Regions:
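Long, well-ordered alpha/beta core segments of mature domains
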Residues: 1-207
Length: 207
């Protein structure tokens, strides 16, 4: 008989009698911070980062999410930690430029890096679309000590159809991987289509 939920983060505990200890396999993440969003957006606009750099960084940060067990994703900013910061699909060379700038903005604005990464993606979309993109803060920053490098290695993408990326040693059809990942991200077919076409219209592609 199932007496508890053992999938996902600690926030999914239910009831008053939950354990207090923090377990690394639950991918612990500290609470987020309150900050002035408009001030942070102003700093992002002055950062000199390109729209493409901000969008790709925000996307890669979120792309590791798995709806099956709620691992990965933008919350925690683990794209700045090992192993994700070294994944080929995350463009380590680009991250080496982008992350220090976003970390400085996070420190100056009192925000988490996780929130600033997402907010920068929003700012870039607003720049190219002229539309306002809703933003909800509250993400926290995990530490390297809170990250199980070995287990996170299994989240490394072998392909990202949204960015037209596929490892050379992968024989699976990329369109099949695209559909599988879209399902893990919880995307509908229209949402998947809009994302792929939106990235292409902005010239965002690994090729």
């Amino acid at each position: 008989k199932l007496l508890h939920r053992d999938m996902g983060p600690k926030t999914r505990y239910m009831g008053p009698e939950v354990p207090e200890e923090e377990l690394i396999w639950q991918d612990p993440i500290p609470e987020g911070k309150s900050f002035e969003v408009d001030s942070a957006k102003s700093l992002i606009l002055k950062s000199g980062l390109t729209n493409r750099e901000m969008i790709e960084t925000a996307w890669c940060s979120a792309f590791s999410f798995r709806g099956s067990d709620l691992r990965g994703g933008a919350n925690g900013a683990r794209i700045a930690l090992e192993p994700q910061v070294s994944w080929e699909s995350n463009k380590p060379g680009q991250l080496a430029k982008v992350l220090p700038i976003l970390k400085e903005i996070a420190a100056e604005s009192g925000a988490s890096l996780a929130d600033i990464i997402v907010l920068a993606g929003n700012v870039a979309i607003e720049n190219v679309s002229g539309m306002t993109v809703p933003f909800t803060p509250g993400r926290g920053d995990a530490s390297q000590e809170q990250t199980d490098v070995d287990s996170f290695a299994y989240l490394e993408p072998i392909a990202d159809g949204f960015l037209n990326y596929k490892r050379d040693d992968v024989d699976i059809k990329p369109e099949e991987i695209l559909l599988d990942k879209s399902h893990l991200l919880g995307l509908t077919a229209p949402e998947m289509t809009v994302l792929v076409s939106g990235f292409r219209s902005l010239g965002i592609s690994t090729d």
